[in-house]
UniProtKB/Swiss-Prot annotation:
InterPro entries given in the database record: CLCR, VWF_A, vWFA_dom_sf
Domain VWFA: 43-215
Annotated PROSITE patterns: VWFA
Pfam families: VWA (PF00092)
Organism annotation: Synechocystis sp. (strain ATCC 27184 / PCC 6803 / Kazusa)
PANTHER family reported in the protein's UniProt record: CALCIUM-ACTIVATED CHLORIDE CHANNEL REGULATOR, ZINC FINGER (C3HC4-TYPE RING FINGER) FAMILY PROTEIN
Protein name: Uncharacterized protein sll0103
Region (Disordered): 389-420
Length: 420
C-alpha cells in the first residue's frame, strides 16, 4: 500500500510586480493499493441510542441494520456494541466475530427506555474500541435520535478529540429530525469522520452499509499532512485549511516549528481526501520558485509499521514579468465546494440571529454556487428553503438538517442499495 499525492495551485503563474498574492492549494491524497493488497482487518464499535424516543420502528430498524453489518464482518474482524439511554452499557465486549448467534441475540434484546446521554455512550465506545485497535481500521458508528438532554455537549466534543488521539474514527448518524446537528457534526469533524442524516427508518440499512463500505476501503491509517513553506509563503490566519471531499469540514492546523501539521485520519483506496489551503505569497523575482513541500506521515496496519513518511513533493510556482493567468479547473471546483459550505454557514448564523432575509439571501447565493458545481439536488433544497423564509414560513427541523447536509456534500439521487 502506497501514498498517492498530488498538488495543484489555483493559478500556477504569479505576477512579479504584485507585492502580495493569494493562491488556493488543492492537495489530494489517497492510499494506492498494490495487486496483492487485501482488505485490512476491521475494528467496529456500534454506539446505539435506545432511549424511549427510539421505541417501535426506529429501534427495530436500527437493530436490523446493525445485524446486517455484523453479517459482513469476517472472523479476524473485531466488534463491540454499546447501548445508551441516560446511562451507557456494554452490549457486546470487544471481541472477534466468531459467535454470530450470541451477538445477534444480545442486540435483539435491546429495548427502548430512558433519556439520552450521548457522551456516556461515546466514552464507553472509545474504551471498548481502543481494546481492539492494534493494526486494524478502527471506526465508531454513533447513532442517536435526540438532543443530549442528560449529557454534556462540551464533553462530547472533548471525547471526539480523545477518539482522534486514540486513532479512532467516529462517524455520527442523526436519526429523525430532533438531534443536534452542531454537536454531531463537531464530534465527527474532530475524529475525522462523517455526519449522516437518516431522515426515515427505511434509510438506516443503506446508510450503515455506505459507512461500512467506506471503512472497508481504508488502506492506510492515522495520516497527517506535513507542510513546510518557504519564507515568502504563508497560510491564511483564519480558517487556512479545509477538507472538501469526501465531505466538507474545517481542519485544525498544528504548528510544529517549521512544519504545519494537519491530521487527516484514514486514507481510502477508492476515493481521495481533498484539502483546500489558503496561501499568501510575498513578492518574488521572475522565474520558477519552490515555495514549499508536502509529505504525508501515516501508519500501515497491514505491515504493522507506524509513522511512515511519503517522499516529499515540492510545490512550485512560475513568476512572470508579463503575467498571464493559468487557472486550474479542479481547484476551481474545490473553491466552489468550500464556498457553498461557507455561504450556508453564514445563512445558518443569520437565521439563528433572527435575520430571516439575510439568511434567505445567503441560501440563494449557496443555491447558485451549487448549480455552478452541477449539484442540482443541493441547489433545489437550498433555493426551496430560501423561498420559504422569504414567504414568512419557518424552516422545520428536517429542512435545517437537509440544509446542513447539502452544505457538506453533493447529494446523489437515491438508489436501491445492494443486498450483497
Amino acid at each position: 500500500m502506497r501514498i498517492d499525492l498530488s498538488l495543484l495551485l489555483s493559478d500556477q503563474n504569479l505576477d512579479a510586480g504584485a507585492p502580495t498574492s493569494q493562491r488556493q492549494l488543492r492537495i489530494a491524497v489517497a492510499a494506492k493499493a498494490d495487486d496483492h493488497d487485501r482488505r485490512l482487518p476491521l475494528n467496529l464499535c456500534l454506539v446505539l441510542d435506545h432511549s424511549g424516543s427510539m421505541d417501535g420502528q426506529p429501534l427495530e430498524t436500527v437493530k436490523s441494520a446493525a445485524l446486517g453489518l455484523i453479517d459482513r464482518l469476517e472472523e479476524d474482524d473485531r466488534l463491540s456494541v454499546i447501548a445508551f439511554d441516560h446511562r451507557a452499557k456494554i452490549v457486546i465486549e470487544n471481541q472477534q466475530v466468531r459467535n454470530g448467534a450470541a451477538i445477534a441475540k444480545a442486540i435483539e434484546r435491546l429495548k427502548a427506555e430512558g433519556g439520552t446521554a450521548i457522551d456516556e455512550g461515546l466514552k464507553l465506545g472509545i474504551q471498548e474500541a481502543a481494546k481492539g485497535k492494534e493494526d486494524r481500521v478502527s471506526h465508531i458508528f454513533l447513532l442517536t435520535d435526540g438532543e443530549n438532554e442528560h449529557g454534556d455537549n462540551d464533553r462530547c466534543l472533548k471525547l471526539g478529540t480523545v477518539a482522534s488521539d486514540y486513532k479512532l474514527t467516529v462517524h455520527t448518524l442523526g436519526f429523525g429530525d430532533h438531534w443536534n446537528q452542531d454537536v454531531l457534526e463537531a464530534i465527527a469533524a474532530s475524529a475525522q469522520g462523517s455526519l449522516s442524516y437518516i431522515e426515515n427508518p427505511s434509510e438506516a440499512l443503506h446508510t450503515f452499509r455506505q459507512l461500512f463500505q467506506r471503512m472497508s476501503n481504508v488502506g492506510l491509517t492515522n495520516a497527517h499532512l506535513l507542510l513546510e513553506l518557504a519564507p515568502q509563503a504563508h497560510l491564511a490566519i483564519v480558517k487556512p485549511v479545509a477538507q472538501v471531499s469526501p465531505e466538507t469540514m474545517d481542519l485544525t492546523v498544528q504548528n510544529q516549528g517549521a512544519i504545519e501539521e494537519v491530521r487527516l485520519g484514514d486514507l481510502m483506496t477508492d476515493q481521495e481526501r481533498v484539502l483546500l489551503l489558503n496561501l499568501y505569497l510575498d513578492q518574488l523575482l521572475p522565474g520558477q520558485h519552490v515555495i514549499g513541500q508536502v509529505q504525508i506521515r501515516y501508519d500501515d496496519p497491514a505491515s504493522g509499521q507506524t509513522n511512515l513518511l511519503s517522499d516529499p513533493l515540492p510545490l512550485t510556482i512560475q513568476v512572470q514579468t508579463q503575467y498571464q493567468p493559468s487557472t486550474d479547473v479542479q481547484v476551481q471546483e474545490s473553491i466552489l465546494t468550500l464556498a457553498k459550505y461557507r455561504q450556508t454557514q453564514i445563512a445558518e448564523t443569520k437565521l439563528k440571529a433572527g435575520d430571516r432575509q439575510g439568511a434567505a439571501t445567503m441560501l440563494q447565493t449557496a443555491a447558485k454556487t451549487a448549480l455552478q458545481m452541477g449539484d442540482k439536488n443541493g441547489a433545489t433544497i437550498l433555493q426551496t428553503n430560501a423561498t420559504r423564509l422569504q414567504s414568512g414560513e419557518d424552516l422545520s427541523e428536517g429542512d435545517r438538517k437537509k440544509t446542513r447536509m447539502v452544505s457538506k456534500t453533493t447529494l446523489q439521487p437515491p438508489s436501491a442499495p445492494s443486498e450483497h
